[in-house]
């Protein structure tokens, strides 16, 4: 069974054709030219659409029926940077591939196992229940893959492992995985909460945001645009949102932006670790987690309080344990392979 995986990020679109039986990638591209990519494939049986926010109703991979499409529309305002892209791609690919089965794969599904104490905001019940104000979590397909792949490299079943995972890319979040299940994560109601990101602020004092609005310093649209597009590494450095550019730049502004970024990632990991009774490994994934050894070193090297140390290998030729032999807690770097998890989940959904 050939599965086309469609993975729209906040600033990218990644397409993969995966043979589900052996999880082999037959073709891939980072392109907006979906039509050309689909046309050059001999057969596509299933299309797996990554949906960043499933809202309260979409909690597992499901066929994109009209009723499901209506629920996706309801979630549009929860992730305005992402969900409309998925809706447009669903429309486009339904026209291009009318005979394929289209499966919607919510990124939030992995975090449905969050215990109520990790899922709940300390807000009045009269707000929480009517409006479904709770922590959903994101990057679920990345965390799912990282859990499975880390277990392979550590030669242990996923159900035996307690992992701290940092997905560091355009969006950044961390997750505590206990016995194969998400038990805590840094993102919440939207993909804006938690760790500092490349352009997004991550968590900031909501009282400060209320002050900016109340005092007329910013409009709601200006505030939203600033928090989503002009904060994070870009906002602090004034140079770039790319860690590679900032490392090579070496200016005081670049170094400071990276230092704040690394500090905020460490803080999120330490907080999330409180949901585990032990840590069997720290896992870095995502474009930055995989391919920016300076960041991994700075983060791991500052987590001595958790028994994690630096001295990591800078080599990134393949998924591997990058901590020194004999490290108390192994550190791994994994290339993110969300397409394999998406293909696997979609194939299971149609069986």
Placement of each model-derived feature along the sequence:
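Phosphate/pyrophosphate-binding loops at sites that engage ATP/ADP/AMP, CoA/4′-phosphopantetheine
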Residues: 35-45, 150-157, 269-280
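Short beta-strand-loop/turn "lid" adjacent to the catalytic site in phosphate-handling enzymes
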Residues: 40-86, 100-103, 108-121
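Short glycine-rich, Thr/Ser-proximal phosphate-binding strand/loop in the N-terminal lobe
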Residues: 3-37
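Glycine-rich phosphate-binding loop of actin/hexokinase-like ATP-binding domains
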Residues: 113-215
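Adenine-nucleotide phosphate-binding core of ATP-dependent small-molecule kinases
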Residues: 225, 232-236, 243-276
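Glycine-rich phosphate-binding loops at beta-strand->alpha-helix junctions
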Residues: 280-303
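Structural signal for terminal/edge beta-strands and the immediately following C-terminal loop/tail
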Residues: 319-351
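Short glycine-aspartate micro-motif
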Residues: 2-5, 46-48, 103, 163-167
